[in-house]
Structure formats: C-alpha cells, structure tokens
C-alpha cells in the first residue's frame, strides 16, 4: 500500500499523467480514496466516479456536472459542447488555484468506448492546454492494466502503475496492533501464532483481516478468552472464507 501511495503522490504532484491502481477487492483502494480526499485539500473538486459502467456520453456528462460550480448551469446536449464546458471548468478551477482530481473507482468496468471517448480525450485535453491542471487515477481489479495496455494512445500516457498487494506477515501484525491501539486496547489480544495464522488465512488482504479479526474478538469476548489463539483464527476462517482456505 505504501509503495502504491508514493507512486500516486508522485504522479499527482508532478502532473505526470494518469495513475493506474490495480488490486484485488479488499486490498485498500477505498482507503487510498479516503486518504487523498482528506490529505490533499487542493485536489478539488474531488470527482469520485463510483459507477463507471456508463456509456461514454453519460460518463462525460456526469464528469462535467461534478466539475461545474454553478448548479444552475445546464449540461449541454452535444458531445462537443460538453467537452468545451469541461475545458472551461478545468481552466477556471486551475486559475483559482485548485487542481481537480478524477478518481475512477472500479475502473475495470469502464467500457472500451468510455476509455477511448471519455478518458483519453480528457487526458489529451489536459496535456494540450497549459492552463489546465488535472490529475486522474484509475483504480480497479487486476484486469484493468492489461485492458489499458490494449490501447496504445492510452497506455503511453500512463506514467505510474501502482499494484496493490496484500500485507506481508510483519505488516499484518503491525496493522492489527495499530487497529487495537486505536480502539483503546491496552495489551495484546492476539497471540503471535494467531497473528501468523491471520496473515496466512487472509492473504494479507485488509478487508479479510478486518472480517476475521473482528469476529475472533467477538467470539473471544463471548467465551471470556484473555487472548485469541491460532486455532480460533483457523476455525473462523473456515466459516467466513470457505473459498480462501
């Protein structure tokens, strides 16, 4: 996650084209979205595209609607007019000291049409106009990167590919301890063997760690255990993640 974060920061701060963030479900893409929204107040407007499975025209119009500061301005009907308004809106934000960020969540769901008729023209527009500062992040399942590489014009503009992988065993242990401290725990609640088991059964994927760890604490509380052991983790993993075993 740290490596992906650093690459994304570099791409954004240097306006080096779009950053592609491929990763399995639960590897932390949503956490990165929250981080950039909170830590980079200059990245405004922060346009978070949650449902990208739209036609190119629908997606382009949605982006314009998010960029417009005057809610009374109507989104034009023609595609050419929509892109003219997008250019004007991006110039206006840049002139006022802001840097818009387009964050495409689940970007693997973007159609080829949307990639070539919405995303690519937006990148070309930003490249060709010195009065526009625009950052673009495409986050999605691992299939996203090979899809983008199919299109030369789009692929050559990608300056950072930041795959999200699961935590290492040490990172899993550190993550769990930090979560417990934030929750007010004053002593370890998982044995070392339990932390190792938690990493093994979760693959280091944060969402799985949270799911199994939370249930282990709940069951441990009900059974009045003072510490969670590896056996409890393995038993719960079989119930909660039968396909991951």
Where are these regions (language model features)?
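Conserved AAA+ ATPase "SRH/arginine-finger" region at the nucleotide-binding site
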Residues: 49-53, 148, 159-172
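Pre-Walker A adenine-sensing motif
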Residues: 1-12
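Conserved small helical "lid"/interfacial subdomain of P-loop NTPases
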Residues: 165-191
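Short regulatory helix/loop adjacent to the ATP-binding pocket of P-loop NTPases
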Residues: 35-39, 142-159
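Walker A/P-loop nucleotide-binding motif
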Residues: 14-35
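C-terminal alpha-helical "lid" subdomain
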Residues: 26, 73, 101, 181-245
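Conserved Walker B catalytic segment
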Residues: 87-91, 95-138, 143-149
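Conserved NTP-binding/hydrolysis module of P-loop NTPases
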Residues: 45, 54-74
């Amino acid at each position: 996650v740290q490596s992906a974060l650093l690459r994304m920061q570099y791409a954004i701060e240097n306006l080096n084209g779009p950053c592609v963030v491929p990763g399995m479900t639960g590897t932390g893409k949503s956490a990165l979205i929250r981080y950039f929204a909170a830590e980079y107040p200059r990245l405004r407007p922060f346009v978070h595209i949650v449902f990208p499975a739209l036609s190119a025209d629908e997606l382009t119009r949605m982006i314009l609607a998010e960029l417009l500061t005057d809610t009374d301005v109507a989104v034009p009907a023609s595609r050419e007019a929509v892109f003219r308004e997008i250019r004007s809106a991006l110039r206006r934000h840049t002139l006022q000291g802001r840097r818009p960020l387009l964050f495409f969540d689940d970007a693997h769901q973007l159609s080829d049409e949307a990639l070539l008729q919405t995303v690519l023209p937006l990148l070309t527009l930003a490249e060709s106009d010195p009065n526009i500062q625009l950052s673009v992040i495409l986050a999605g399942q691992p299939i996203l990167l090979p899809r983008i590489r199919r299109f030369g014009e789009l692929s050559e503009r990608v300056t950072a590919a930041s795959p999200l992988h699961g935590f290492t065993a040490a990172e899993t242990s550190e993550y769990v301890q930090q979560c417990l401290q934030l929750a007010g725990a004053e002593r370890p609640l998982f044995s070392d063997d339990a932390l190792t088991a938690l990493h093994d059964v979760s693959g280091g994927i944060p969402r799985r760690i949270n799911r199994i760890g939370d249930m282990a604490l709940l069951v441990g509380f009900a059974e009045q255990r003072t510490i969670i052991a590896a056996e409890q983790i393995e038993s719960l993993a079989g119930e909660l993640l039968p396909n991951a075993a």
